Amino acid sequence: MPPISWPTGTAPGVNPTETGGRLINAIAERAPAGSRSEIVWRRVAGLIARFTTTQTAIRGALLVGSVLYVVSGNRVYSITSSYVVTELTGTVGGSGPVTMARNMKAPVPDVLIVHSGGMSQINISGASVAVFSDGDLPSVNSICWVDGYFIVTAESGLAYQSGLNDTTFASVDRTTAEADPDGLYRAIASGSDLILMGTASLEFYANAGNPTAFAFNRSVVVPIGLKAPYAVAGFEPGFADTVIFVANDNTVRRLQGYEPAPISGPDLNRLIEAVTNPAELVAWVYQAAGHAYWVLSGPGWSTTFRPAAGTSARAMVFPIGAAATASPPGASGSPSTSKAARRSS
């Protein structure tokens, strides 16, 4: 009898008669030479709870040296490598996910946070967080750091740079992403590139060392945009792949140089299209057992991509919002606490 064709990815189809099979909490690997099968199936990495905060949800985190700074609810916590948790004094405004960045100021770096209510600054030496404001900045919606500069973006399409390893901004040190009148969702740094991401275009900038105004010059424009502010990941330090994002055409795309190559299939494209509030799409990354993973979570579902293998799997164990809260599957506890976890291979 013919061998059973086991799936190597997730392709459920619209109805059972067209399904290509599904991998749930599992990945397919090519077997070593001489094995009885060309493919082996392994479970995906799990989660181990490591610390608990007193707030309801983790909104964002940033590693500064060996200390992790976590925004949870309206509080900020520092977590050491031995999982000692310290609550910083002060609060963070806004709601929902935040973006965070640090510079290379010596001996103590600056850390800035952008949230829906404005900006905040972490004082590492003082173990505190407070409102950050600069009269030269409008209302901003994201932050990143590249080549010594904080870069913040505004929905209007403006991007501002800070002083070199400083938190001061000048109204003239800015540029406008004007290849398309789509505004800006995010600024991210990928290698030596600054990428300004609008709803219908990506603009790549390179550091030209301009002595006045914006230090970066635009180099490449890609006519594909970002569907939602938090639907992009892969630019994080140490991630062994490249930037992957949900595009404005409801596909998942992987940057190969300046080419955003689609990597999602029709099933996931339909799932993305059905999301009524794109802000619920959250992407994140992790690495385990030598594999790099990119995860997209929507309302009630998560899908994992292994970019190097070109395969995907469905992660059914995550509760709604797991990508944003980093809560372990099935985590228990009172509603007033939030648990954070690390991957286990």
Residue ranges and their predicted role:
Residues 105, 110-112, 133-134, 185-345:
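Beta-sheet-dominated scaffold domains
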Residues 1-86, 139-205, 209-210, 281-284, ...:
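N-terminal beta-propeller domains
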Residues 87, 124-135, 167-172, 211-218:
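A short alpha->loop->secondary-structure connector
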Residues 50-54, 89-94, 132-137, 175-179, ...:
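Surface loop/turn motifs at the tips and blade-to-blade linkers of beta-strand repeat domains
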Residues 79-113:
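A broadly used, surface-exposed interaction patch
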Residues 75, 118-120, 201, 251:
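A short loop-to-beta-strand structural motif that recurs across blades of beta-propeller domains
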Residues 101-133, 152:
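Hydrophobic or amphipathic alpha-helical targeting/insertion segments
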Residues 82, 116-118, 124-127, 146-147, ...:
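Acidic/polar residues in short coil/turn loops that connect beta-strands
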